[in-house]
C-alpha cells in the first residue's frame, strides 16, 4: 500500500470513520454541482425532508445543456429549460452560490472553480461529473460521483469510498514545439490503456509536469478518468501558489502565508511509497490523434492507423469495432484524414491559454472550404479575457465561429452536435460512439493547436509544419 503520498495525507485528514463495510466515510471540502446530475439528488432530499447540510461548501453553475448561440429564455429545448429552472430553484431554496448565464462567472464547472480560486491544494472535491479529476492539478483529491452520491454529499457532506492505490506516473524532459499537455495525457492513456488505472489514483510527477502551467496541468488531470483512474493529481508547488494568489476565494494576507506553508506540507514525501511507478520520456511524445472509439486508441500524427496484427490480442476486438465505426483503413496514415467539423473548447481545453495557443496558429490563415469550425470559451471570464486580448477577432477573421461559454460539442446535451457521419477534430476528452450528437458521427481527439491545423487544411495535419 502507498504511504506518505499526497493522496494518503489528504485522505487521512478527511477520514471521518471506517464504515462496517470497510469503506471510508470521507468528508468533502467542496461540492460542485450542475444542472444535469443535481435535480434528482435534490428531489431525493425533498422526499426525506432533508436540507443541504453545508450550503457554503456547495457551488452551482450551468454548463452541459447551455446553448452557445441563442441563449434566450425559455430555451427551445424543453428538457434543457426544465433543468435550468430546477437548478435555479434548488440553489435559491438551499442558499447555494449559483453562477447563472450572464453573471460573468458562469461556465464549465471544472473551469470556473479553479479560475476563481475555489479549488485549492489539500481539498477533497466531488462533483456529479466524470472529469472532476481536473481539480487534482492543484494537489486536491477530486472525484466524479453519481447522482445518489450527489444526494449523499448534499445531505451529509461525506462519501463512502474505498481507498485507492497510488500509481506514480513520471514524465521527464522538455516537450518539443507543437507538443502539448493534451498529447502527453493521450500518450499515457495509449500506453497504459483505458482500464489501466482502475483502482488507482494517478500521481503525475517528473520534470515535464513541473514545467507545465496550471492550465496545462488541468488538461492532464482532466483526462485521468479516461485512463481508468478515479482521480489524478500533481503535487502543489510554486506554479500552483502563483496561480492561486489573489484569486476571489484564495486566502489573503497572513492566511495566505499559513495556507502556503500547509500546502507545502501535504506534498508527497521524498521517500513516499507507491503501489506502482511508470516512467515516460517527453522526447517520445509527438502530436497525438485518436483514431478509434476510446481515448486509448491514439497514435502520433506521423503514424498509421494500427493493423490488427500490430495490436495485443486483447485489443483486437475493440479495434475491429473501431475500424468499422470510424471507417478508417488499418495501415492508412491518420494524417490527411478528411475533417468536417472542428471544435475548440471543453473542460479539457477551453481555458485562456488554450485559446491563445490556438489563435497563434489561426492568425493569418483561413478555415478550409466546407469545414465548420467554432471556438467555445470554457467560461464567461475566459470569453471576456479572450475578447480583451482580441482573440475573438483572430478566430472570426480566420473563419471560426465565436460562441458563448458552455460544454458545447463535447457531448450531445445541447444544440452543438455532429450531423450524420460527419467527422470532427475536437479538443474535448471523449471519442465514444455518438458522443458528439450523431449515432454515426466520428470524433478525433487532439490538442487545440492541432484542431486549428485540421481546420485550415480540411484534414488531419501536423501543427509542427505551421511552426
Curated annotation (Swiss-Prot):
Its cofactor is [4Fe-4S] cluster. Binds 1 [4Fe-4S] cluster per subunit. It is an enzyme of class 4 (lyase). One of its GO terms (molecular function) is metal ion binding. InterPro entries: 3-IsopropMal_deHydase_lsu (IPR004430), Acnase/IPM_dHydase_lsu_aba_1/3 (IPR015931), Acoase/IPM_deHydtase_lsu_aba (IPR001030), Aconitase_4Fe-4S_BS (IPR018136), Aconitase_4Fe-4S_dom (IPR036008), IPM_dehydratase_rel_enz (IPR050067), IPMI_cat (IPR033941). Keywords: 4Fe-4S, Amino-acid biosynthesis, Branched-chain amino acid biosynthesis, Iron, Iron-sulfur, Leucine biosynthesis, Lyase, Metal-binding. Pathway: Amino-acid biosynthesis; L-leucine biosynthesis; L-leucine from 3-methyl-2-oxobutanoate: step 2/4. Gene3D superfamilies: Aconitase, domain 3 (3.30.499.10). It comes from the Bacteria. It catalyses: (2R,3S)-3-isopropylmalate = (2S)-2-isopropylmalate. Its EC number is 4.2.1.33. Pfam families: Aconitase. The keyword Iron applies. The keyword Protease does not apply. [4Fe-4S] cluster binds at residues 347, 407, 410. GO terms for biological process: L-leucine biosynthetic process. Catalyzes the isomerization between 2-isopropylmalate and 3-isopropylmalate, via the formation of 2-isopropylmaleate. Heterodimer of LeuC and LeuD. Belongs to the aconitase/IPM isomerase family. LeuC type 1 subfamily. This is 3-isopropylmalate dehydratase large subunit.
Amino acid at each position: 500500500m502507498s504511504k506518505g503520498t499526497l493522496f494518503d495525507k489528504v485522505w487521512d485528514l478527511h477520514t471521518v470513520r471506517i464504515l462496517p463495510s470497510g469503506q471510508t466515510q470521507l468528508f468533502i471540502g467542496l461540492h460542485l454541482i450542475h444542472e444535469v446530475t443535481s435535480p434528482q439528488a435534490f428531489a431525493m432530499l425533498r422526499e426525506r425532508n432533508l436540507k443541504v447540510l453545508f450550503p457554503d461548501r456547495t457551488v452551482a453553475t450551468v454548463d452541459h445543456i447551455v446553448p452557445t448561440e441563442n441563449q434566450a429564455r425559455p430555451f427551445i429545448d424543453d428538457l434543457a429549460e426544465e433543468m435550468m429552472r430546477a437548478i435555479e430553484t434548488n440553489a435559491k431554496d438551499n442558499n447555494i452560490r449559483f453562477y447563472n448565464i450572464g453573471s460573468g462567472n458562469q461556465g464549465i464547472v471544472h473551469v470556473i472553480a479553479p479560475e476563481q480560486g475555489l479549488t485549492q491544494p489539500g481539498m477533497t472535491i466531488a462533483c456529479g461529473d466524470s472529469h472532476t479529476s481536473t481539480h487534482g492539478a492543484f494537489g486536491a483529491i477530486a472525484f466524479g460521483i453519481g447522482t445518489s452520491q450527489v444526494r449523499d454529499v448534499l445531505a451529509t457532506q461525506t462519501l463512502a469510498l474505498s481507498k485507492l492505490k497510488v500509481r506514480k506516473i513520471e514524465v521527464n524532459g522538455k516537450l518539443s514545439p507543437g507538443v502539448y499537455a493534451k498529447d502527453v495525457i493521450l500518450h499515457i492513456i495509449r500506453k497504459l490503456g483505458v482500464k489501466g488505472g482502475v483502482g488507482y489514483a494517478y500521481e503525475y510527477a517528473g520534470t515535464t509536469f513541473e514545467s507545465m502551467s496550471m492550465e496545462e496541468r488541468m488538461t492532464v488531470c482532466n483526462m485521468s478518468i479516461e485512463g481508468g483512474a478515479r482521480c489524478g493529481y500533481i503535487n502543489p508547488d510554486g506554479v500552483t501558489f502563483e496561480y492561486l494568489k489573489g484569486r476571489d476565494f484564495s486566502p489573503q494576507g497572513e492566511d495566505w502565508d499559513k495556507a502556503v506553508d500547509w500546502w507545502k506540507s501535504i506534498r508527497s514525501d521524498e521517500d513516499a511509497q507507491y503501489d506502482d511507478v511508470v516512467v515516460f520520456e517527453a522526447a517520445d511524445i509527438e502530436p497525438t490523434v485518436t483514431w478509434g472509439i476510446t481515448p486509448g486508441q491514439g497514435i502520433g500524427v506521423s503514424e498509421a492507423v494500427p493493423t490488427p496484427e500490430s495490436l495485443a490480442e486483447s485489443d483486437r476486438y475493440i479495434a475491429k469495432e473501431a475500424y468499422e465505426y470510424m471507417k478508417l483503413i488499418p495501415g492508412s496514415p491518420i494524417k490527411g484524414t478528411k475533417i468536417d467539423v472542428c471544435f475548440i473548447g471543453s473542460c479539457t481545453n477551453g481555458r485562456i491559454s488554450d485559446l491563445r495557443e490556438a489563435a497563434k496558429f489561426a492568425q493569418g490563415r483561413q478555415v478550409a472550404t466546407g469545414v465548420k469550425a467554432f471556438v467555445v470559451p470554457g467560461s464567461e471570464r475566459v470569453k471576456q479575457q479572450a475578447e480583451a486580448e482580441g482573440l475573438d477577432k483572430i478566430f472570426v477573421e480566420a473563419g471560426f465561429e465565436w460562441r458563448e461559454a458552455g460544454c458545447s460539442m463535447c457531448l450531445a446535451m445541447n444544440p452543438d452536435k455532429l450531423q450524420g457521419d460527419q467527422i470532427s477534430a475536437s479538443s474535448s476528452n471523449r471519442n465514444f460512439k455518438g458522443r458528439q450528437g450523431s449515432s454515426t458521427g466520428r470524433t478525433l481527439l487532439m490538442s487545440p493547436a492541432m484542431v486549428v491545423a485540421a481546420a485550415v487544411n480540411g484534414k488531419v495535419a501536423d501543427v509542427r509544419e505551421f511552426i
